[in-house]
Amino acid sequence: MTPLGRLHLLRVLSTPPVFLLGLLLALPLGAQGLSGVRFSASRTAHQPPQKHLTHGLLKPAAHLVGYPSKQNSLLWRANTDRAFLRHGFSLNNNSLLIPTSGLYFVYSQVVFSGESCSPRAIPTPIYLAHEVQLFSSQYPFHVPLLSAQKSVYPGLQGPWVRSMYQGAVFLLSKGDQLSTHTDGISHLHFSPSTVFFGAFAL
């Protein structure tokens, strides 16, 4: 007659695998050596996403304010009022130096003003123009990027004012230079909000 202990061992070994799987699933997680699994999964599911600060997202930008010079020309400044140079831009010989290649929005505004014409004087037109130019190693001369012109006929009605604003997107290369040329400088109405010039990377 087979001992009782051996019979019990034979029954366990002959138990179908499906039954053993069901028995394992019915055991507590601690008995399976999986304690904390449910807590860890829950914590991961409700954990707020971490914010990663990516360096190098600060893009070049420049804003210049116009001032008159002794040579009757338009002088740009970056260290006064609301003017600035950021993240690679520099001002050299009254020109903006492009720090990196890419797309840039270039803009400029000028405001002209003048007095009315004397009743005895013969009205003559005043030519006003403002242009943003590109100087690059790819071209042997200054290339116009933005250009605007106006003619004013001073009358007897009183002082006159004319404004010009220009802006567009350009593909520029590192080392390119942006400058301006203005006709009618003696009529420029200088202030930080009326005469300015700048660019920023997109």
Curated annotation (Swiss-Prot):
PANTHER family, from UniProt? LYMPHOTOXIN-ALPHA (PTHR11471:SF31), TUMOR NECROSIS FACTOR FAMILY MEMBER (PTHR11471)
Mind listing the UniProt keywords for this protein, alphabetically?
Cytokine, Glycoprotein, Membrane, Secreted, Signal
Quote the InterPro entries the UniProt record gives: TNF (IPR006053), TNF_beta (IPR002960), TNF_CS (IPR021184), TNF_dom (IPR006052), Tumour_necrosis_fac-like_dom (IPR008983)
Record-linked PROSITE patterns: THD_1, THD_2
Q: What is its main location?
A: secreted
Residues bearing glycans: N93
Keyword Plastid applies: no
Assembly notes:
Homotrimer, and heterotrimer of either two LTB and one LTA subunits or (less prevalent) two LTA and one LTB subunits. Interacts with TNFRSF14.
State if Secreted is listed as a keyword. Answer: yes
BP GO annotations: cell surface receptor signaling pathway; defense response to Gram-positive bacterium; humoral immune response; immune response; lymph node development; negative regulation of fibroblast proliferation; positive regulation of apoptotic process; positive regulation of canonical NF-kappaB signal transduction
Where does the UniProt annotation locate this protein? Secreted; Membrane
Q: What is this protein called?
A: Lymphotoxin-alpha
UniProt cross-references to Pfam families, sorted A to Z: TNF
